[in-house]
Amino acid sequence: MEDAVYQEFLELEQEHWWFRGRRTIFVSLLDRHFGRDPGGKRLLMDLGCGVGGMLEQLGEYGQVIGTDVTLKGLEHCAARDFERLVACNGPAGCFGDESLDCISAFDALEHIPDDVGTLREIHRMLKPGGLLIASGPAYQFLYAQQDRIVHHVRRYTLGDFAAKARSVGFEIEKATYINFILFPLILPIVLLLKIVQKISKPDDTKAGSNVGIGIPRIVNETLAGVFGGEAKLLRAFSAPAGHSLVMVARKPGPTR
């Protein structure tokens, strides 16, 4: 990501509706598929931890290590007193075989050219019975300036996302689109912005992310409630469409 976006995310992630909503969904999925164990011995890795937006929550499930390809994000994590941090250019060689109980990749795989190779490395590092929880942006036809600013290589369909995980040996426990309630509102806005940007040709290096657009507090709170409220609905079904997606997958074998 551009350096300015790291700073922007640091300032927004605690209060902005998008960050809050997705955290609620991710925590709900981890509660159901992994279970809390604060202070326990289970070892988790957050791949592409950025400025540490999920490290505190992941600490409720065991000992968490944050990894990122850039020092900029890890510097922000260290400033927030997160201590277990590793700089590595992708997961290859970062950890030994079958050494981790859970790996999270929240909006990380879409940044990596060889996402299947990364999934293969994740599978290698997980213990038998270990869990992968991964999220990403949905639908390539929505690829726009925002994706370029944060250095996305691609966007996914849910079928493609899950198929890539299966191809390296994972069993899928849950795969769903998220941000599906607001998607009918988001979709025309994104498509309109794509048209405007195609005409105006803005400079990506000087633009901030679209999450930095200021909105009234009451609107932010409402949107956070709507997005986060999807967590309860997703206990009963998987959404057929949405602006993002999330997958919970397990490496076959008895949990150690």
Residue ranges and their predicted role:
Residues 82-84, 150-153, 190-193:
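Short, hinge-like loop/turn segments at secondary-structure boundaries
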Residues 116-131:
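A short glycine-rich, Lys/Arg-flanked "PGG" loop and its adjoining helix->strand segment in the class I
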Residues 182-256:
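A C-terminal cap/extension of S-adenosyl-L-methionine-dependent methyltransferases
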